[in-house]
Amino acid sequence: MAIHLYKTSTPSTRNGAVDSQVKSNTRNNLIYGQHRCGKGRNSRGIITARHRGGGHKRLYRKIDFRRNEKYIYGRIVTIEYDPNRNAYICLIHYGDGEKRYILHPRGAIIGDTIISGTEVPIKMGNALPLTDMPLGTAIHNIEITLGRGGQLARAAGAVAKLIAKEGKSATLKLPSGEVRLISKNCSATVGQVGNAGVNQKSLGRAGSKCWLGKRPVVRGVVMNPVDHPHGGGEGRAPIGRKKPATPWGYPALGRRSRKRNKYSDNLILRRRSK
């Protein structure tokens, strides 16, 4: 991804650093409208997810996470911007006439060919079971349950690594640093997700963030005591606690929130480090 800097004619262009976005040229049979209900509210209209609301209307692009078009070569026709995710998507034309969207692998260009199935070449963009991959392969769009489609390592720049295979399981190191076991029969896509430099992007102004459906975030230390545990005091005061807390008084910033005795605890060999 190329970061584009504007001429500093206004404060917003001085602080902004955006990517050179690919034009969107979506197909009508692969997109459909979605009802973004609530804007962070539940069925009673109460805010359950803060800092959400507004934003530009979006059309959902149907992404092929299963990659079940087996043993048929497909050609990358377009690389497009998707408003529903940080990663780019690319339109694939298969030899049997099928057309689908997939996540854009980093380094893939228009005209490249991909294929999915067992014992296919270890090439960027190809999808195959973990049992057919050599150790050390960089992968993304990884299945957790066979046939359900990729669920892990799908964000922009995400990449996991196959580090071991033993018995019926394969050991993966995920982007978060977590090391876990997954069935060797599950499929994954070779390579890294594209648009890896998305974290270098700076919106530059509040209005650009509003377009994304993100509302302003107010610090608890500048609120009143009735609104936040960190609030109150004369002037600039500390939070008045040993440890930071959420607006509802629960421990924040470091407290482990994973549910205890979860079924997948036995599959996690090392907890995530991020």
From Swiss-Prot:
One Gene Ontology term of the molecular function aspect: rRNA binding
Origin superkingdom: Eukaryota
Localization (cell): Plastid, Chloroplast
Transmembrane segment boundaries: none
GO biological process assignments: mitochondrial translation
Coiled coil region boundaries: none
Keywords: Chloroplast, Plastid, Ribonucleoprotein, Ribosomal protein
Keyword Plastid appears in the UniProt entry: yes
UniProt-listed PROSITE patterns: RIBOSOMAL_L2
Disordered as annotated region, ranges: 1-21, 224-274
Record-linked SUPFAM superfamilies: Nucleic acid-binding proteins, Translation proteins SH3-like domain
Keyword rRNA-binding annotated: no
Any Gene Ontology CC annotation: mitochondrial large ribosomal subunit
InterPro entries: NA-bd_OB-fold (IPR012340), Rib_uL2_dom2 (IPR014722), Ribosomal_uL2 (IPR002171), Ribosomal_uL2_bac/org-type (IPR005880), Ribosomal_uL2_C (IPR022669), Ribosomal_uL2_CS (IPR022671), Ribosomal_uL2_dom3 (IPR014726), Ribosomal_uL2_RNA-bd_dom (IPR022666)
Family annotation (NCBIfam families): rplB_bact (TIGR01171)
Subunit structure: Part of the 50S ribosomal subunit.
Family indicated by similarity: Belongs to the universal ribosomal protein uL2 family.
Descriptive protein name: Large ribosomal subunit protein uL2cz/uL2cy
Upper taxonomic lineage: Eukaryota, Viridiplantae, Streptophyta, Embryophyta, Tracheophyta
UniProt gene name: rpl2-A
